[in-house]
Amino acid sequence: MPAYKRVLLKLSGEALMGDDAFGINRATIEGMVNDIAEIVKLGVQVAVVIGGGNIFRGVAGGAAGMDRATADYMGMLATMMNALALQDAMRHASIEGRVQSALRMDQVVEPYIRPRAIRQLEEGKVVIFAAGTGNPFFTTDTAAALRGSEIGAEIVLKATKVDGVYTADPKKDPSATRYTTISFDEAISRNLQVMDATAFALCRDQKLPIKVFSIVKPGALKRVILGEDEGTLVHV
């Protein structure tokens, strides 16, 4: 029995690379889509916000001397490429994915329209939100917090390459332990970088919990949906 009826899944662009140094690894994206298909079959309504860091990172571009707003718009276009790849992989897995973009690109995808997104979720379609918030200076984590709040998601599932939030970097500190649950305030006081500050504050204000888990760990997404001990739950 699923623990959640409607979720917002945040996928980082980097997660789509698999073991590659750049771009989209087809086997990796197919594995993610198969995981999503499993929870859709359980009757869970799934919306996805996807990053673009495997193609272009606005923050990195800005740091290299590029105008930050221009770099961020380029990053938004990178998320569009990822969203279309995800939608295509879903089609091959017999899931109906619908891409809605915060930037208008009418020949390619639908614009973001909240009531339409909610209706599509209720119809069992997976809605993929592309182009972040549509505004520069906001990350795709913030887009996940925003869209999750707008569609009435019960939780934001932050899919990463690490299986939760740790007391320290587990790659550097072998004694680091994983938090099973932690409050927003505790995460802030311990300076744990769960999401960027804007996204984190929005989730906290909206009382929207965050689950951090590993998307590369087989079966982890399904275990999260079933309410099993997987990843770290950040709560009010």
Swiss-Prot record:
Residues annotated to bind ATP: 10-13, 53, 57, 160, 166, 169
Free-text activity regulation comment from the record: Inhibited by UTP.
Known pathway: Pyrimidine metabolism; CTP biosynthesis via de novo pathway; UDP from UMP (UMPK route): step 1/1
UniProt-listed InterPro entries: AceGlu_kinase-like_sf (IPR036393), Asp/Glu/Uridylate_kinase (IPR001048), Uridylate_kinase (IPR011817), Uridylate_kinase_bac (IPR015963)
Predominant place of localization: cytoplasm
GO terms classed as biological process: 'de novo' CTP biosynthetic process; UDP biosynthetic process
EC number(s) reported in the record: 2.7.4.22
Signal sequence extent: none
UniProt: UMP binding residues: 52, 72, 133-140
Localization: Cytoplasm
GO MF, one example: UMP kinase activity
Record's keyword terms, sorted: ATP-binding, Cytoplasm, Kinase, Nucleotide-binding, Pyrimidine biosynthesis, Transferase
CDD domains to which the protein is assigned, alphabetical: AAK_UMPK-PyrH-Ec
UniProt-listed HAMAP family: PyrH_B (MF_01220_B)
Function of the protein: Catalyzes the reversible phosphorylation of UMP to UDP.
Record protein name field: Uridylate kinase
Originating species: Cupriavidus metallidurans (strain ATCC 43123 / DSM 2839 / NBRC 102507 / CH34) (Ralstonia metallidurans)
Gene it is expressed from: pyrH
